[in-house]
């Protein structure tokens, strides 16, 4: 790997990592006021769209000056840049949530867990009511299904409560964010491999 390529990989990885790091900062500043739909639209939808555009641009940038840009080289470029960026994001998360604002992290995510259970409850009961109204369930089947849903919700609520009590008592583990890094890199590797198939030079096979 030439020095110019190494430097460009590092610069692009740092730039993408800084972009990633904006999101936990936005969560800290505005997360409490966001609805779940806005949160997932911004932190998953917008994030993934911008990441995709950026990483494809980087791939094309390297393709323009690389004498060989087969699948292996294409994937290597995309994954190295992504791995650097996600590593920077992980450092930001650990610094922000473990060191400076652990209480805020717990508050934000505990509320989100409760909201998710509430949404699941509304959807499940609405689906059950519609099935009963349409005549797909008799009275006994409806009551049995409703009891199962309520039992599942009760178990979910108690599990979530226990989870956050444990975190409050023991603190936020750094392994949580390290685990997220490994999880993200696994799926990003698959996504990068798909992109590399399109970005590589078609007449080069590796």
PLM segments and residue spans:
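Alpha-helical transmembrane segments of multipass membrane proteins
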Residues: 19-27, 50-51, 85-89, 93, ...
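Functional transmembrane-helix hotspots
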Residues: 91-139
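Juxtamembrane interface at the cytosolic side of transmembrane helices
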Residues: 2, 6, 61-63, 67, ...
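Individual transmembrane alpha-helix segments
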Residues: 145-186
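Transmembrane alpha-helical insertion/packing segments
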Residues: 1-68
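Hydrophobic secretory-pathway targeting helix
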Residues: 62-98
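Alpha-helical transmembrane segments of multi-pass membrane proteins
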Residues: 7, 11-15, 76-85, 179
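Membrane-water interface at transmembrane helix exits
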Residues: 27, 31, 59-63, 88-97, ...
